[in-house]
Amino acid sequence: MKNWRTLILGLVICANTAFAAPQEVDKVAAVVDNGVVLQSDIDGLLQSVKMNAQQSGLQVPDDSTLRHQILERLIMDNIQLQMAKKMGITITDQALDKAIADIAAQNRMTLAQMRSRLAADGLSYDTYREQIRKEMLTSEVRNNEVRRRITILPQEVESLAKQMGNQVSGDTELNLSHILIPLPENPTQQQVDQAEDLANKLVADIKGGADFGKLAIANSADSQALKGGQMGWGKLQELPSLFAERLQSAHKGEIVGPIRSGVGFHILKVNDMRGADQTISVTEVNARHILLKPSPMMTDEQARAKLEAAAAEIKSGKTSFATIAKEISQDPGSAMQGGELGWASPDIYDPAFRDALMKLKKGEISAPVHSSFGWHLIQLVDTRQVDKTDAAQKERAYRMLFNRKFAEEAQTWMQEQRAAAYVKILDGSNAQPQ
């Protein structure tokens, strides 16, 4: 995970009041459907982005260009927050507190330490908390709306899983940065040519030594633009197919693109690469058990004592586990099979049952064990390692297809929402009016 400042400031979606100018009357910068973007929102995020860029070593463009990017970001956030309100989506305090606690834990900080670090950088905890709530709301709206537009067919999963099995680099991960030069819906040829010319110019500038992050902040329409276009780590096969195809033979430091898609022209930078090729092996157990259920006719102590007596008889050789299971076990599914449960992952069992089972040696019988089902006498018959690579590959293939399609569809959906919204820019603020 990126350092905590990048994470915190990367999530900022409203103004940090610590940066506003209280002596001035706040102004409306843009009307967005039934909401507004305030000038203080823009000013606050402008200062936050500059501070974050300084701490991350990123160069930023001039204020006019940066304000344009920030206003577009705030307009999209405003649209999505209004959608959340209409849809009745809320983030509970409990969910919010857990998300913040997770952020702190992932950055190896206590909540108290996070509060102190926020204060040191001029961010009040309450303001930050509400910023995270809004980010969670916009993510929830986007996820709900985009997810329903995605269809994954079984043959797609089979095909990708087979492809992954044939590719040595199927699990290659890349750390990427991204610039999107957008196109409007139904663009004219002139608009396409202008966007392509700009994309080609940016590629040439980057290859000539220009800072990718600065150009991303100044030009990209991607949601990560204000973070210098940094996408972070992701598996090759999780990327949009247009990207994955072009990155198959890419190497660290390479600039890839421009790549034309339905939403514009994309430029990628491969910041780093890492790979992992592994076989998925899991432990399965073959166990048998005898179950006694406490009832008005049998107390817990009586059930335990009866199982202890049964264990003593089995260990002395007077009877077998299978025989006594058929006689007294109250598990109808296994009693007639001599208590045999068959091969299975230990994780399917009740935690108390599982934990006791995993402590046994082959052939060993447990002491009476209490679970949510009653009292058990357990015997571990055998264990084995099973190759689950094929099943795991299909599961990964499904996740990769979903992530790939989500990334492609999310950008289209966001452009559609921006085009459909009523947006009026006031006082010459920099944005694309509708």
UniProtKB/Swiss-Prot annotation:
Places the protein is found: Periplasm
InterPro entries: OMP_Chaperone_SurA, PPIase_dom_sf, PPIase_PpiC, PPIase_SurA, SurA_N, Trigger_fact/SurA_dom_sf
PpiC domain ranges (all copies): 171-272, 282-382
Domain of life from the UniProt record: Bacteria
Catalytic activity: [protein]-peptidylproline (omega=180) = [protein]-peptidylproline (omega=0)
Keywords: Chaperone, Isomerase, Periplasm, Repeat, Rotamase, Signal
Entry's EC annotation: 5.2.1.8
Gene3D superfamilies for the chain: 3.10.50.40, Porin chaperone SurA, peptide-binding domain (1.10.4030.10)
GO function terms (MF aspect): peptide binding; peptidyl-prolyl cis-trans isomerase activity; unfolded protein binding
Signal sequence interval, chain numbering: 1-20
GO cellular component term of the entry, any: outer membrane-bounded periplasmic space
Keyword Chaperone among record annotations: yes
Keyword 4Fe-4S belongs to the record: no
Disulfide cysteine pairs (residue numbers): none
One GO term of the biological process aspect: protein folding
Pfam families recorded: Rotamase (PF00639), Rotamase_3 (PF13616), SurA_N (PF09312)
Biological role: Chaperone involved in the correct folding and assembly of outer membrane proteins. Recognizes specific patterns of aromatic residues and the orientation of their side chains, which are found more frequently in integral outer membrane proteins. May act in both early periplasmic and late outer membrane-associated steps of protein maturation.
Domain notes: The PPIase activity resides only in the second parvulin domain. The N-terminal region and the C-terminal tail are necessary and sufficient for the chaperone activity of SurA. The PPIase activity is dispensable for SurA to function as a chaperone. The N-terminal region and the C-terminal tail are also required for porin recognition.
HAMAP family linked: Chaperone_SurA
PANTHER family, per database record: CHAPERONE SURA
Name of the molecule in the record: Chaperone SurA
Organism expressing this protein natively: Yersinia pestis bv. Antiqua (strain Antiqua)
